[in-house]
């Protein structure tokens, strides 16, 4: 069953202009994420226009929607609730707020202060044994006399060295080293990374309070704090942190992300599925298009003469039309419309190759001839965009000829990225959902 589309009404007016701008912005953002070759500095997308030629639509089948369309996507809501809760917890305590602004992230604040993490338990016997140095008493004593704006020499035995920022924050708050619980100091002071460990001038033994490799691996999950990330040498030393089975294969317990025993990976629930309803339906539609859709781009080419990246010249590319032949999927589920295209092999499996042979009428650069020995244009690995017509212009023109003619590499790169964006973003299992 064929369908006639009033293309002018569907793509004009304020709604059509807004949709065209959204498509332009979407393609532009995708180009900003593409790694560019050395001879291209940047790619900008300036305009998009639907053109005047409407596509040919032919309904092939009504069927049940794909199971992928029933996945319940609630990550955004739950994520916002969690972030609000973390923010509320972080700003309840002024010490937590100071620590999160100066040193740590809010994720570290919500973790319990136990001996299994980088912040050790201050009431642990092992901790008190090695931190019984009297170095904490001078914090509320003689150093108060140092002027705030005068240079301060390094004082041996004082954690933090010559930095006066955290010291004045603690002294102005009326906190004394002999009166303040060590848990508050370790959890909220700017000396989080140095306070619990004795300084090089101290008397304690560092090996007594250093966490084991397994405990350190748990703390290393917080990758936002550079101080908590060990170097490659400390992460995988030869024969120190990795034990071996009798057969000689090492254990990877110091890598919590890739470990098969990670409870976060084992306890990950399967995606929630919405309930199917009788009114849900899906349409498979054969789409053929050979129109004048337009896309305007600018790629800045770098010239390496007389020196590398000497100057950049703008190359203007105008896509003046495309040739497309594929099967579209439109699914209606509970006030949601899911839209995508099928890959060539999936389309032939669902609608059959006999009803999917109209593409031979519009040959393009990626389309072979109709001879029996040539491969089908819809074999695996070929883009659904069979042909992209483009006009290029670089620099100024003299007597109708371009100053620089060797722009084929830039054209091929830009057009290849246009095909890749289309195939990766609009071909199943990728799809777009519209709320109606």
UniProtKB/Swiss-Prot annotation:
Biased composition (Basic and acidic residues): 85-98, 244-255
Cellular localisation: Mitochondrion outer membrane; Endoplasmic reticulum membrane
Taxonomic lineage of the native organism: Eukaryota, Fungi, Dikarya, Ascomycota, Pezizomycotina
Gene behind the chain: mdm12
Protein family (similarity comment): Belongs to the MDM12 family.
Subunit annotation: Component of the ER-mitochondria encounter structure (ERMES) or MDM complex, composed of mmm1, mdm10, mdm12 and mdm34. A mmm1 homodimer associates with one molecule of mdm12 on each side in a pairwise head-to-tail manner, and the SMP-LTD domains of mmm1 and mdm12 generate a continuous hydrophobic tunnel for phospholipid trafficking.
Top-rank taxon, per record: Eukaryota
UniProt membrane topology term: Peripheral membrane protein
Biological source species: Emericella nidulans (strain FGSC A4 / ATCC 38163 / CBS 112.46 / NRRL 194 / M139)
UniProt keyword terms in alphabetical order: Endoplasmic reticulum, Lipid transport, Lipid-binding, Membrane, Mitochondrion, Mitochondrion outer membrane, Transport
Mitochondrion as UniProt keyword: yes
Main location: mitochondrion
Biased composition range(s): Acidic residues: 73-84
Pfam families cross-referenced by the UniProt entry: MMM1
Notes concerning its domains: The SMP-LTD domain is a barrel-like domain that can bind various types of glycerophospholipids in its interior and mediate their transfer between two adjacent bilayers.
Matches recorded under InterPro entries: Mdm12, MMM1_dom, SMP_LBD
All copies of domain SMP-LTD, residue ranges: 1-436
Record's protein name: Mitochondrial distribution and morphology protein 12
Compositionally biased tracts (Polar residues): 190-206, 222-243, 256-267
Gene Ontology, cellular component aspect: endoplasmic reticulum membrane; ERMES complex
Disordered: region residues: 73-98, 184-275, 352-380
One GO biological process term: mitochondrial genome maintenance
Membrane in keyword set: yes
Function according to Swiss-Prot or TrEMBL: Component of the ERMES/MDM complex, which serves as a molecular tether to connect the endoplasmic reticulum (ER) and mitochondria. Components of this complex are involved in the control of mitochondrial shape and protein biogenesis, and function in nonvesicular lipid trafficking between the ER and mitochondria. Mdm12 is required for the interaction of the ER-resident membrane protein mmm1 and the outer mitochondrial membrane-resident beta-barrel protein mdm10.
Gene Ontology molecular function: lipid binding
């Amino acid at each position: 069953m064929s369908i006639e589309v009033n293309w002018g009404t569907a793509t004009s007016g304020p709604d059509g202009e807004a949709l065209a701008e959204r498509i332009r912005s979407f393609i532009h953002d995708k180009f900003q994420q593409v790694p560019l070759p050395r001879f291209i500095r940047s790619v900008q997308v300036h305009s998009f226009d639907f053109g005047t030629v409407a596509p040919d639509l032919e309904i092939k089948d009504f069927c049940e929607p794909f199971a992928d369309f029933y996945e319940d996507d609630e990550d955004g809501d739950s994520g916002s609730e969690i972030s609000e809760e973390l923010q509320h917890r972080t700003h309840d305590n002024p010490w937590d707020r100071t620590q999160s602004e100066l040193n740590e992230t809010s994720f570290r604040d919500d973790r319990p202060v136990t001996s299994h993490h980088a912040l050790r338990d201050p009431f642990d016997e092992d901790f008190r044994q090695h931190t019984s140095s009297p170095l904490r008493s001078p914090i509320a004593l003689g150093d108060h006399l140092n002027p705030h704006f005068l240079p301060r020499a390094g004082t041996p035995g004082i954690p933090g060295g010559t930095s006066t920022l955290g010291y004045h924050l603690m002294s102005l708050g009326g906190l004394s080293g002999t009166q303040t619980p060590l848990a508050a100091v370790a959890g909220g002071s700017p000396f989080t990374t140095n306070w619990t460990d004795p300084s090089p001038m101290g008397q304690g033994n560092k090996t007594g309070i250093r966490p084991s490799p397994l405990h350190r691996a748990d703390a290393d999950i917080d990758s936002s704090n550079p101080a908590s990330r060990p170097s490659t040498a400390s992460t995988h030393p030869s024969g120190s942190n990795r034990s071996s089975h009798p057969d000689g294969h090492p254990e990877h317990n110091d890598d919590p992300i890739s470990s098969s025993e990670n409870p976060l990976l084992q306890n990950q629930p399967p995606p929630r599925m919405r309930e199917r309803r009788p009114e849900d339906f899906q349409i498979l539609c054969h789409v053929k298009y050979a129109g004048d859709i337009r896309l305007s781009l600018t790629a800045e080419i770098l010239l390496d003469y007389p020196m590398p990246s000497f100057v950049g010249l703008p190359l203007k590319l105008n896509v003046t039309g495309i040739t497309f032949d594929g099967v579209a999927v439109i699914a209606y589920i509970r006030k949601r419309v899911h839209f995508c295209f099928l890959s060539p092999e999936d389309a032939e499996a669902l609608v059959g190759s006999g009803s999917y042979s109209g593409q031979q009428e519009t040959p393009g650069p990626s389309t072979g001839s109709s001879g029996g020995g040539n491969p089908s244009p819809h074999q695996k690995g070929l883009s659904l965009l069979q042909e992209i017509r483009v006009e290029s212009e670089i620099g100024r023109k003299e007597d109708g000829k371009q100053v620089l003619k060797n722009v084929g590499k830039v054209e091929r790169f830009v057009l290849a990225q246009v095909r890749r964006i289309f195939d990766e973003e609009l071909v199943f299992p990728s799809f777009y959902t519209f709320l109606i």
